[in-house]
């Protein structure tokens, strides 16, 4: 493809936008990749679109290699499908709902499980048509409450979403593994430093999921990993090793103490001279059918909201009871709660269940119990893992300690099972003539977010440093004083054509600009290789070559320039 800057729309700017916090957002605006239209809405300019298409091409190649079939579904979806699946209300305010002129309800698709399941139930009748995997690369819309960080968290974005259909769970798991491997190939080919981590299934649903996290200090997600094994999980899903051994026998007698004004674990620890990890805290959440449930944790631990909302009987999404509801149900404020004589059901975190001689609220304002013991003083009841892990916990596989890193989620894969096929009655007949619900998987990649994540991993003070597969151009050809020198123009023309004929994507900066301006722009937009032709270089038969990653330039023979790239 022939491309000179005079024929291209190079929209670089020096100023950093006031609302751009992340380096990726700043550089995408300054490099002329994006322009903001409204909150969370961006126009991709020609330079940015070239990068976006490079990422989409890699995704498409690997999806095709894995046997997936490309299709394209409507962005606008009928409300009736989402009502069938139960997500019309459950999805929340991020689902942009609209009405047409006939007062029919629709939404802008944030994802396409309902649409693809509708296609499957109409088109798939027999097990002989399986397995199948469909994918699309298409614009999505989610009405984010606070769009920020450019295309890292925008309302409109480009996404690859795929959906597999199998007869049974074994087939679904095989499809999942195939997509998992395809995702590894995609992000490896794109040159990204990433981790595949266990993840919560969120609003999509299903029983099993992995996220693909690009490691970056500015990432919104916390990636938890073992320093001695392959274990890795999003902090929402991460677990520590279960407590080992039996609870020791009680030592002291339970005693009620007055604690006027004490409302927190820290205040109780100071008042009673106990360690926070020797106390429990009690949180009240809403259960199914307007009931209340207490969640009990060790005093120094924090509740993992995602784990909690998946507990049997707990409302999804998680909702905390307010003080009025707590007082009506229990008779005291939130700072005086505890499991002893608690009139509502409770679930105990497995670490709290190991405590001996612990302290807790007495369910009476300004009073607490000390030296409380499970079974002796209060039945233990249900036990579950509901706490957030902390750095230094033992890995759940018993190998190493848990460490934390920041990550940007760029992809996620799900085993859905029959979550959608059962609700929408998508079935096929098996080899015995029996009707079976389709077993589904779904697999998403944020194509536009991947571009931003790559910049977060690959930039310096001068601009973007593109991984080779994502670069908008492979080589920047920069002449010095070309408009004053016929020799320089002629040498540029010759080399430009040689590079194009050899299959390289070249951007020839043929502007009437000072060399420093051209060098700065080429560094800003991140082209991996730069060639500089000048009168002095031609006198010596050389071209100046500089890799974007390198601080130093080197001279190469004009006759052997192509050998640099082989």
UniProtKB/Swiss-Prot annotation:
PROSITE patterns, A to Z: AA_TRNA_LIGASE_II
Entry's Gene Ontology molecular function annotations: aminoacyl-tRNA deacylase activity; ATP binding; proline-tRNA ligase activity
EC number: 6.1.1.15
Catalytic activity: tRNA(Pro) + L-proline + ATP = L-prolyl-tRNA(Pro) + AMP + diphosphate
Major place of residence: cytoplasm
Keyword field: Aminoacyl-tRNA synthetase, ATP-binding, Cytoplasm, Ligase, Nucleotide-binding, Protein biosynthesis
Keyword Transport: no
Top enzyme class: ligase
Any one GO cellular component localisation term in the record: cytosol
Record has Nucleotide-binding as a keyword: yes
BP GO annotations: prolyl-tRNA aminoacylation
Taxonomy, superkingdom: Bacteria
Record's subcellular location: Cytoplasm
Database matches in InterPro entries: aa-tRNA-synt_IIb, aa-tRNA-synth_II, aa-tRNA-synth_II/BPL/LPL, Anticodon-bd, Anticodon-bd_dom_sf, Pro-tRNA-ligase_IIa, Pro-tRNA-synth_IIa_bac-type, Pro-tRNA-Synthase_IIa_type1
Family from the record: Belongs to the class-II aminoacyl-tRNA synthetase family. ProS type 1 subfamily.
Record remark on domains: Consists of three domains: the N-terminal catalytic domain, the editing domain and the C-terminal anticodon-binding domain.
NCBIfam families on file: PRK09194.1, proS_fam_II
PANTHER family attached to this UniProt entry: MITOCHONDRIAL RIBOSOME PROTEIN L39/PROLYL-TRNA LIGASE FAMILY MEMBER, PROLINE--TRNA LIGASE
Annotated function: Catalyzes the attachment of proline to tRNA(Pro) in a two-step reaction: proline is first activated by ATP to form Pro-AMP and then transferred to the acceptor end of tRNA(Pro). As ProRS can inadvertently accommodate and process non-cognate amino acids such as alanine and cysteine, to avoid such errors it has two additional distinct editing activities against alanine. One activity is designated as 'pretransfer' editing and involves the tRNA(Pro)-independent hydrolysis of activated Ala-AMP.
Record note on quaternary structure: Homodimer.
Name of the protein this chain belongs to: Proline--tRNA ligase
Gene encoding the protein: proS
